[in-house]
Amino acid sequence: LASEELRTHFPNLENQLLLVSSTPIRNMGTLAGNFVNASPIGDLTIFFLALDSTIILNGTEIRGQARYDRSVRLRDLYKGYKQLDMSSSEILTSVRFKLPSKNTRFNFEKVSKRTYLDIASVNSAIRLEVEGDTISEAHVSAGGVAPIPKYLANSSAFLARKPISKD
């Protein structure tokens, strides 16, 4: 993993990435490709949904040939099985998300028949922002539970402003 900043903010990322596909595919694949493939169990999609990421799409208007950029929340990209809020003239050019702070708790999990070289049966990720003993913000996502990668808005809203306890 080349990014020192990502290693700093996501100390478990290298181990988590070992669960994604195989070494040759990881070396050839792209984050954008993982998103626009629209697999309901895409590991990196679930990871970045929990980061409440926004993507930037660059496109060309067909008639006027004018170039444009538009921003789409990753959670709004998926409209149905393999259906995206993205035209054939658009490409994904960047991904934006807030870096975790010292008050951030983040976890990604993947369940599959084999530990390595296997697609997920189900996967999930959660990002919590904690202030004292209260969850100030929550973002939860899951794959393998619907025809699209799911940002769990109701679960996220339910957790926000809840106290943290050992129970």
Language-model segments: which ranges?
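C-terminal structural segment of proteins
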Residues: 1-167
